[in-house]
Amino acid sequence: MGSGSYGPYGSGGSGSQPYADTYGVYPSALQADKNDKEIYDPQKGYPVNPTAKEISHAIVNEHIEIAGKIPDGPITYVLNENNEIIIGKRSNPINPSKRSPHPMLVGGKDPHVQCAGMITFKKGKIVSIDNQSGHFRPNKKSMEKVYQVLKKLQGSNPKLFSNSFNWRET
């Protein structure tokens, strides 16, 4: 489940895609997903993860809640084309026992994002964020866009961030 190092979902040592305004699903990951009807529907593409939520809409009493629970650990995120950070626990709407990759946070046949990776929470507070997505493989330069969105969020919700918040470059 997630962004492994090898196979169609990992970089296998090749790293990220070249810097771009947006990133589509890496070709080998997309092809592997198209071969799995519980991940990718030929008519509709990726289904939307039922827990996907814009991060500011997940704030409850100065912490994040996803599907009614306070996250404690890594959660998937994407920065969509509208400068919104979408977060969600791994939840496949077709088959809950199957994996739920980053493209399911936005859904569709050809999803594009500005960045994607993992946000780590401790008791619902943001601790760190990275660009580790085996499906989109965003360039680390794209993290600046994420940082800008988080700075705005921090300005209006300073207690949402852990005192140990750090920026993990990858």
Regions found by a protein language model. Give the residues of each.
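Short, basic/low-complexity N-terminal boundary segments at the transition from targeting/disordered tails
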Residues: 55-59, 97
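Low-complexity, glycine/serine/proline-rich disordered segments
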Residues: 1-55, 170
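Polybasic phosphoinositide-binding surfaces of eukaryotic membrane-targeting domains
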Residues: 62-96
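Intrinsically disordered, low-complexity regulatory segments
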Residues: 51, 59-62
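Helix-rich interaction surfaces within compact, conserved domain-sized segments
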Residues: 36, 101-170
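Polar low-complexity intrinsically disordered regions enriched in Ser/Thr and small residues
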Residues: 5-18, 27, 48, 71, ...
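Intrinsic-disorder/low-complexity loop/linker signature
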Residues: 45, 83, 124-125
